[in-house]
From Swiss-Prot:
Induction note: Expressed in the late phase of the viral replicative cycle.
Name this polypeptide is given: Cell surface-binding protein OPG105
Lineage summary: Viruses, Varidnaviria, Bamfordvirae, Nucleocytoviricota, Pokkesviricetes
Domain Alpha-carbonic anhydrase: 1-235
Organism of derivation: Monkeypox virus (strain Zaire-96-I-16) (MPX)
Cellular component terms per the entry's GO annotation: membrane; viral envelope; virion membrane
The encoding gene: OPG105
Intravirion-side segments: 295-304
Amino acid sequence: MPQQLSPINIETKKAISDTRLKTLDIHYNESKPTTIQNTGKLVRINFKGGYISGGFLPNEYVLSTIHIYWGKEDDYGSNHLIDVYKYSGEINLVHWNKKKYSSYEEAKKHDDGIIIIAIFLQVSDHKNVYFQKIVNQLDSIRSANMSAPFDSVFYLDNLLPSTLDYFTYLGTTINHSADAAWIIFPTPINIHSDQLSKFRTLLSSSNHEGKPHYITENYRNPYKLNDDTQVYYSGEIIRAATTSPVRENYFMKWLSDLREACFSYYQKYIEGNKTFAIIAIVFVFILTAILFLMSQRYSREKQN
C-alpha cells in the first residue's frame, strides 16, 4: 500500500483509543530559537536544543524547526482537521531521531527518523503574549527568503496547549519529502486575530504581473485516508463520544454566546418592547437547559 500522505482529516469516531499511549515527555526548557525565516511559502524558526521522549517514542527526538501555517480568513488555516473542523492556523514542530541518525537529512530517509507535533491556533478575543514574541519578529523577514536572528527570549513550552492528549498516525511531511509520524494535540492555543493577520503581510517568493504577492494563505488540504491507515488517540473519551469532543466544545461555546446575546437583548428591551424581551428570556432558559444537558452527557462520557 502507498504511504499515507499528510495532512488528513481525523474522524474521532474512527480513531482507536489506546490508553497505552503514555503522556509525552517534552523537554523544551533548554530549546532556543536561533533564526527566523520567510521561505516565501511559510514562516520557519530554527531551534537549538530541546527534545521529546516517552509516549510511544523509542528514544529521544530532538527539535529542529517549527513551521507556521495560516489561511486568508480566521475561520480556516490549519493543515489537519478534526471532524472536518478547520482551525485558524497550525504550528508544526519538526523533530528527528538523533540517537540513530547523524543529521536531519539522514533521518528523513528512514521511516523512524521524523516526528512532527501539530499545535492548532484558534482566534479568540485575547492576545497571546507568548505567540506575540514570534509576531514581533515578522517585520525583519517581510520579503521572501529573508532570514534574521531571533532576538527575543522565547520559551516554546509556553505555546503548548493546556491538555496534552494526542492523536497519532503515520504519514509524511507536509511537502511529502519524507515519512513522518504525527502527534496532533486537538486542544488549540488561543491567539488574537491581529496576531494572525500579521502573517498575511509577508511577501511570497512569486510575483503577480510584477506586483508584490503576499502569503495570504499557505495551509494544505487534507488527503483521503488509505484503507490501512490507523489513527490512535491517547485518551479514553473517544470510546464513548458520539460527536467530536472538540467540535462539541465549540458548539457549546456558540450556544453560550447566543445565550448571553439573548440575555443582553432581554435587559435592553425589558422596559420598551416587553414582547421581544419575554421571547428573549425564554430563549435564555431553553439554551441554559440545553447547555446543562450537554455538559451532563459530556461528563458521563468522560467517566465511561
